[in-house]
């Protein structure tokens, strides 16, 4: 899974050997949580989650409360998020928890944040009515399943590691348009990295210059895809893309044409195209988003 995100596609193949990659640290932690073969002391993690849920951090200020209070969350929630993230990092540095346990707790924190965030589904902006609801509740991730001991998890630019692994199927689901994931999910990435940078503007975003994806840029997307496809070591390449085409908002326009995709995949082998209609995410505002098609381009690799 070359652009794994939170791992929804890879999870459908949980009984197989998985190689997953994403350049965002927040998604990397999710992948470690779901797919890493490292063992977990579930009793220890559950006890920590119970401790965090019952902890009163209302008298403590920290990086999160000082920078994000009364934005995506109220002050009390921000105080708790900051305390949990700092404590988890300290436990990991002390060796009290291993890498996967560390990732499980952070992933649980992200899911808890998403359930009560005062947003429309991402962190590009927040709802400014001051009506915060719900409390932060960390739950144990449901990852008690047998995993392949040869699973590999990467936090990297996909193009830089594509040549390292030999697989049966390489699934590619890159960004479709100019909307950078590091912009929409900057807060989760900030909490994941835990470097406590300065934040700016109403949305409280950190500097994301080094996090931008080439696949979101028209002049670089085709070049990046061709480089990736040439490096992959696999029997099949399954490429997912939609037909956003020309929308009223140019940011939503697809960065790769069908011609680009077929030309590039054909470098490696024969290409078939499968289509399925779907309703794009637009908060119900656009009639143009009702005729979208998800396309799957399947390349049977010959060279």
Protein language model features and the residues they cover:
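A short helix-to-beta-strand connector/capping loop
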Residues: 144-152
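General small-molecule cofactor/ligand-binding pocket signal
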Residues: 19, 152-154, 272-274
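Conserved SAM/SAH-binding loop
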Residues: 155-160
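Conserved Class I SAM-dependent methyltransferase catalytic core
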Residues: 213-269
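Conserved proline-anchored active-site loop of SAM-dependent methyltransferases
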Residues: 1-13, 20-25, 163-184, 240-242
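A short acidic (Asp/Glu
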Residues: 10-13, 29-33, 164-167, 180-189, ...
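Class I S-adenosyl-L-methionine-dependent methyltransferase module
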Residues: 17-19, 24-145, 178, 182-218, ...
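Class I S-adenosyl-L-methionine
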Residues: 255-303
């Amino acid at each position: 899974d070359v652009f794994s995100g939170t791992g929804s596609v890879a999870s459908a193949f949980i009984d197989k050997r998985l190689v997953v990659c994403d350049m965002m640290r927040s998604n990397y932690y999710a992948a470690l949580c779901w797919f890493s073969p490292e063992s977990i002391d579930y009793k220890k993690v559950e006890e920590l989650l119970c401790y965090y849920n019952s902890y009163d951090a209302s008298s403590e200020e920290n990086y999160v409360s000082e920078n994000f209070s009364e934005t995506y969350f109220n002050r009390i929630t921000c105080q708790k998020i900051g305390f949990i993230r700092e404590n988890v990092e300290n436990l990991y540095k002390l060796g009290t928890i291993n890498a996967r346990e560390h990732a499980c707790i952070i992933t649980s924190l992200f899911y808890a944040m998403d359930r009560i965030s005062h947003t429309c589904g991402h962190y590009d902006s927040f709802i400014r009515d001051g009506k915060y609801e719900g409390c932060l509740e960390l739950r144990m991730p449901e990852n008690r399943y047998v995993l392949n001991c040869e699973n590999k998890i990467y936090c990297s630019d996909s193009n830089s590691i594509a040549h390292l692994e030999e697989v049966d199927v390489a699934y590619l689901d890159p960004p479709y348009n100019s909307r950078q994931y590091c912009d929409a999910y900057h807060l989760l990435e900030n909490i994941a990295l835990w470097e406590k940078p300065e934040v700016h503007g109403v949305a409280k975003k950190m500097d994301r210059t080094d996090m931008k994806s080439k696949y979101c840029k028209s002049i670089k997307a085709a070049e990046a895809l061709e480089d990736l496809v040439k490096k992959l070591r696999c029997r099949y390449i399954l490429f997912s893309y939609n037909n956003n085409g020309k929308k009223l908002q140019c940011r939503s326009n697809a960065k790769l044409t069908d011609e680009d995709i077929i030309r590039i995949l054909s470098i490696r082998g024969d290409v078939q195209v499968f289509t399925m209609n779907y309703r794009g995410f637009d908060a119900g505002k656009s009639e143009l988003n009702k005729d979208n098609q998800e396309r799957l381009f399947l390349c049977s690799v010959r060279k």
